[in-house]
Amino acid sequence: MPRMIVSIDGVVIKEVQLTKERTTLGRRPYNDIVIDNLAVSGEHAVIHMAEHEVEIEDLGSTNGTYVNAKAVKRQDLRNGDTIEVGKYQIRFLQEAEGQNFDKTMIFEPGMVPAVGP
């Protein structure tokens, strides 16, 4: 499940799981991700999620939205991208579907074809 890790000056403030098709980000208290700082607009940006695609859209904010240090209006997000709003950094993390490396598979005799002559 995609998630956002919000930090300032290297200190993590919060972690938010993205569970909705539309997640709002801004200074106002009704946003899904609230960043209470004057450098962040009341309705700063929105994160759209559809299937396996996630994108961020700037909502005409005063100070802009940056992805990997580049000003964007609308941008697809990739695992590890850094979003900047004001002095805040938001790390976007998205685990690949179906990768359950922590699970052990047990094969019984006859389940795997024999190799060799």
Language model regions located:
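Regulatory inter-domain linker segments that are low-complexity and enriched
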Residues: 1-3, 88-117
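Forkhead-associated
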Residues: 3-8, 12-87
